[in-house]
């Protein structure tokens, strides 16, 4: 069914990467943007021309050209300029460096995670704490402080989850308030959302996703099947483990340490206890990127468990937590 509205966009759009996320996003651009597809370019590190053929037939330009630190500026300048948009949906292309280029050239920017250059997550020369999502996220925020209030918009880590799920969480808080008969106007600030979360008794937010993908070979009993980006998933699995820790939780777990030291084991070697049986803890931006939005700063504000404090290089911890290996 055709959408009832379309967003008119007069600029050009550059996709970096044509992996699993881009393949889902490009149809949305076609459906919801009022613009010719001839103004859309996809730059990819691998040749996926067969996969993207239905869109190149409609006018999308497809270029196979890996982006590295040394050629990044030249490649980007070839396809976009002031008023255009970059969708960085790749792996191993630095989000922070691309954002910095976008600021200099007045180009809009959006990505689904703060991605580093290649060979970062498993580089033993880089301290563990600097390989966490927490560190990458706040490094991007520190960089953005230099841009000022009139900077070109850059929306970071805003895909489906994290991203769209943040809007679902807000709707859920309003629905819980309605069911609990808590009278509250729709919050208009972080502080008001935090106050509403406290009023309705929110302590833990468990995001459960129902994957509707169907494979041509049924999943076997006890088999794990990855249904999204293989490079993205393996990259997450190589990162240190981290959790968001609530101010209502007065003690650290047995092998938990504060954020500034980084984690001492990889995500996919850390088990976690959830409603679902037998999970392993995987790196995910949702573990820390919602924390600054929902802290309660009223009564008992700032009384985090012993061991939680400043994050890496003095960045605010917001309850970020690292996990040490089991003995």
Give residue spans per PLM region.
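Glycine-rich adenosine-cofactor-binding loop
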Residues: 12-27
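Conserved Rossmann-fold cofactor-binding substructure of NAD(P)-dependent oxidoreductases
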Residues: 67-79
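Adenosine-phosphate binding glycine-rich loop
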Residues: 126-201
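NAD(P)-binding Rossmann-fold cofactor-contacting core
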Residues: 34-54
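Rossmann-fold cofactor-recognition segment
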Residues: 56-70
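C-terminal catalytic/substrate-binding lobe primarily of soluble NAD(P)-dependent oxidoreductases
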Residues: 175-327
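Rossmann-fold NAD(P)-binding glycine/threonine-rich loop
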Residues: 93-107, 112-151
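A short, basic/flexible loop-to-alpha-helix module at the beginning of a structural domain
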Residues: 1-11
């Amino acid at each position: 069914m055709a959408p009832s509205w379309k967003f008119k966009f007069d600029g050009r759009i550059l996709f970096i990467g044509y992996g699993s996320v881009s393949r889902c996003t490009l149809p949305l651009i076609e459906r919801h943007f009022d613009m010719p597809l001839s103004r859309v370019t996809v730059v990819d590190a691998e040749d996926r021309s067969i996969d993207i053929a239905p869109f190149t037939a409609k006018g999308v330009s497809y270029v196979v050209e890996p982006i590295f630190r040394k050629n990044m500026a030249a490649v980007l300048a070839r396809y976009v300029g002031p008023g255009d948009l970059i969708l960085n949906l790749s792996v191993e292309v630095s989000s922070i460096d691309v954002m910095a280029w976008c600021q200099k050239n007045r180009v809009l920017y959006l990505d689904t995670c703060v991605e580093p250059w290649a060979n970062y997550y498993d580089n033993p020369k880089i301290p563990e704490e600097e390989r966490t999502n927490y560190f990458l996220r706040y490094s991007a925020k520190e960089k953005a402080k230099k841009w000022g209030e009139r900077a070109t918009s850059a929306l970071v880590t805003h895909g489906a989850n994290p991203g769209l799920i943040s809007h679902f969480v807000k709707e859920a808080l309003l629905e819980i308030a309605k069911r609990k008969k808590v009278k509250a106007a729709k919050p208009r600030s972080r502080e008001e959302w935090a106050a509403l979360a406290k009023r309705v008794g929110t302590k833990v937010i468990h995001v459960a996703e129902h994957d509707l993908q169907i494979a041509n070979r049924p999943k076997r009993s006890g088999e794990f099947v990855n249904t999204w980006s293989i490079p993205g998933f393996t990259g997450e699995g190589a990162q240190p483990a981290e959790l968001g820790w609530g101010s209502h939780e007065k003690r650290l777990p047995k092998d938990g340490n504060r954020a500034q030291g980084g984690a001492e084991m990889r995500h996919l070697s850390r088990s976690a206890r959830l409603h679902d049986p037998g999970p392993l803890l995987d790196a995910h931006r949702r573990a820390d990127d919602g924390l600054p939005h929902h802290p309660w700063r009223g009564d008992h504000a700032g009384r985090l468990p012993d061991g939680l404090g400043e994050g890496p290089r003095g960045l605010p911890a917001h309850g970020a937590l690292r996990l040490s290996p089991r003995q």
